[in-house]
């Protein structure tokens, strides 16, 4: 005679079934690592330890050094690098105060981020690399082109302000509110933030920025998906990771004097002697006209608007971005 299973046995079976299923459904996904075939490293430059990523090695091919924007990291270039790395040897910097690079110091000023990149190029012994920058990184490479005219072979700028500081930007890459609603300073939330309520400050006291680093990766990814429906999941994941790593500007003075200070490009466009291209986000006719007028100052350059793309145009419209870059590179 077969006995019926006891109630306690049934509970045990149910518990085992739940244990087998629940970890797969509620466990947090880990942040992504370095893409296959890539490497990373550190170099001492301009008084700090700079961290960089290196795409699949392309020895003997032209070098590109990529410089990201505020609150991002070097991996935010991943998908664009995949499209270019067969023809170019690509290095992606973590800017000071970002990613795994050392933080800002009390002696930094508006020239510091520019000198970081210049000293990185020299420390790595690159001969006339192509310099590419997005947003704040775009302003950085503009200034390098003007202030160190013999350093680069060409300058590539993705949606940086031109002719001054900032301006002309579409949505940025911060996770507070609509993409780009990050504020110079904010107060840490009293309760653990939900993925739809995650304020993010570009500067502030250390406690504020450290609290942001504790945002859950899955929550950042969920917010990134909602804010940026055009982005590939790879872009969103590295964007989320960069927000967990951001450790820049522990006071508003550093943000103004160093980060914003690096973006004061003024009349730099007219001083750049090497070939240059500026990719701008989509914009209304009057703004496009103003951009093209400012671009006339370039000696050997042009400006192209990327239709349908906002500030992070290499995420919003990667195919068109790559097409424009290949056309430009073919002229070098």
Model-derived regions: residue spans:
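Short N-terminal helix/helix-N-cap motif within the alpha/beta-hydrolase-1
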Residues: 74-82, 100-103, 139, 165-166, ...
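Active-site loop/oxyanion-hole signature of alpha/beta-hydrolase fold enzymes
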Residues: 46-48, 53, 95-132, 136, ...
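Catalytic active-site module of serine/aspartate enzymes centered on a nucleophile-bearing elbow/loop
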Residues: 301-332
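Alpha/beta-hydrolase fold catalytic core
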Residues: 2-15, 22-62, 87-88, 127, ...
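Conserved alpha/beta-hydrolase catalytic His-Asp/Glu region
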Residues: 167-168, 174, 179-271
